[in-house]
Amino acid sequence: FIDFASTLFGTSPDLALARFSLAILEKQPRETLSEILAQVYQDSGLMPLSLAAGTAPVFDRLTSHTAPEPATSSELVSVIVPVFNAADLLPSAVHSLLAQSWSSMEVLLVNDGSTDNSLEVAQALATQDARVRVIELGRNRGAYAARNAGMAEARGTFITVHDSDDWSHPQKI
């Protein structure tokens, strides 16, 4: 079906990602998955990605082929990450942010009243990298309130947001 859609619509990132998802469901080898994934990003003019070996979920094995070209500006970017019961996913999200080509950043993990061990995970991540700060809201107030609390604490010239269950390409920022 995807090949047929490609003949009708040409190449597109959406079709390539659909091909990637289908290949995962078909349990294609890691090398095949890496080839498809690399092509998606190369076609978009971005650094290609691949999958690291292992048994972790695909999301946790995304990796870049080479280190991204470091950004030259020193403007601080604040990345606000609302966190609610995301202990299992938060490390992948934060590591993808810390691997950005733009290193002049702060990552604000705003714990929004999590009832799992998200706060402890966030605090552990903050001890591993000085660019990570934890803000504790105490009770669940919702993602918008968490983002607003992060904005009040942000020190960056530029501010962006990132969900606690997301992964970012190394050239996002």
Protein language model annotation of sequence segments:
Residues 117, 166-173:
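Acidic donor-binding/catalytic loop of UDP-sugar-dependent glycosyltransferases
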Residues 112, 162-164:
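Active-site acidic Asp-centered loop
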Residues 85-89, 114:
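Donor nucleotide-sugar binding loop of glycosyltransferases
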Residues 95-104:
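Short, acidic, metal-binding catalytic loop of nucleotide-sugar glycosyltransferases
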Residues 137-154:
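Glycine-rich, basic loop-to-helix element that forms the pyrophosphate-binding segment
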Residues 3-75:
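Non-catalytic membrane-proximal stalk/linker segments that position and tether the catalytic domains
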Residues 111-120, 139:
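A conserved acidic beta->alpha catalytic loop
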Residues 159:
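Short aromatic/hydrophobic "clamp" motif used to bind/position activated sugar donors
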